[in-house]
Amino acid sequence: MALGGVGRGGAARAAWPRLLLAALAPALALAGPALPEVLFRCPPCTAERLAACSPAARPPCPELVREPGCGCCPVCARLEDEACGVYTPRCAAGLRCYPDPGAELPPQALVQGQGTCARPPDTDEYGASTEPPADNGDDRSESILAENHVDSTGGMMSGASSRKPLKTGMKEMPVMREKVNEQQRQMGKVGKAHHNHEDSKKSRMPTGRTPCQQELDQVLERISTMRLPDERGPLEHLYSLHIPNCDKHGLYNLKQCKMSVNGQRGECWCVDPIHGKVIQGAPTIRGDPECHLFYTAHEQEDRGAHALRSQ
């Protein structure tokens, strides 16, 4: 993924856990209560890592926060209207990082540091914290986590004090479940013709957990039991996982895509909304395969086959 002006060394690798959260946000929101919370924790801030923080890492500023990702050194929090993103310091208390309203790909805008720190329009909806500002960086317990996670509600990123860091002995922190409307619009955008199929899709909705939700459950269960390496270890193996893109009814969105890697868009393909099977004849490309065109033809073929069987 693009690094938005941040070096590709340790700082970039340290942010991998948050990139994973960005990718998982739609999945977590759709998983519902069927699974336990998916948990992620950063490696401990050792004495050596703390000693490596230079005095310049404590500049005079209104609020100190931890470095992006799993960093241990204190940095100045970004203030209101300042630029922010995945690889930048967190926004100050009470602020969140939002992409530009006109951004075509909000998560990508945040990865590239093109967000802006702003106050949430509705603090009740997003759960903005009313707790005191973030700590000054003195407490570096073993279980400090990457607090600045990205979700896909238009690419919002939590502010500095939206969560308290977990203290020694507390090994887990649940990933916040929030609405994921924008990501679903981006991933499920297949043109007007697709929306004409919504009624027929609803009428054929399976009862209980749908195939898409079941596949999603399996992926989340696998991730929740993974032993994630620390920030020095690559997490490329996570990109081999396909996280299914389910719609609000639990059906597969016509367009399914792999995650972007090293700034290159992942491949996208078209599937049947009920069973998730690849639609024959539809392309697999790094872009929009215009699945609604192929689904229309696929649906007509199914109806024709059903009519023949009924005769």
Swiss-Prot record:
One matching Pfam family: Thyroglobulin_1
Motif (Cell attachment site): 286-288
Domain (Thyroglobulin type-1) ranges: 209-291
UniProt-listed GO biological process terms: regulation of insulin-like growth factor receptor signaling pathway
Alphabetized GO MF terms: insulin-like growth factor I binding; insulin-like growth factor II binding
Keyword Signal among record annotations: yes
Region described as Disordered: 112-168, 188-210
Position of the signal peptide: 1-36
Record InterPro entries: Growth_fac_rcpt_cys_sf, IGFBP-2, IGFBP-like, IGFBP_1-6_chordata, Insulin_GF-bd_Cys-rich_CS, Thyroglobulin_1, Thyroglobulin_1_sf
Location of this chain's protein in the cell: Secreted
Sorted UniProt keywords: Disulfide bond, Growth factor binding, Growth regulation, Secreted, Signal
Disulphides: C42-C70, C45-C72, C53-C73, C61-C76, C84-C97, C91-C117, C212-C246, C257-C268, C270-C291
Residue ranges constituting the IGFBP N-terminal domain according to the UniProt record: 38-120
Origin superkingdom: Eukaryota
GO cellular component annotations of the record: extracellular region; extracellular space
Record text about domains: The C-terminus is required for IGF-binding and growth inhibition.
Known function: Inhibits IGF-mediated growth and developmental rates. IGF-binding proteins prolong the half-life of the IGFs and have been shown to either inhibit or stimulate the growth promoting effects of the IGFs on cell culture. They alter the interaction of IGFs with their cell surface receptors.
Subunit structure: Binds IGF2 more than IGF1.
Name of the protein described by the UniProt record: Insulin-like growth factor-binding protein 2
Origin organism lineage: Eukaryota, Metazoa, Chordata, Craniata, Vertebrata
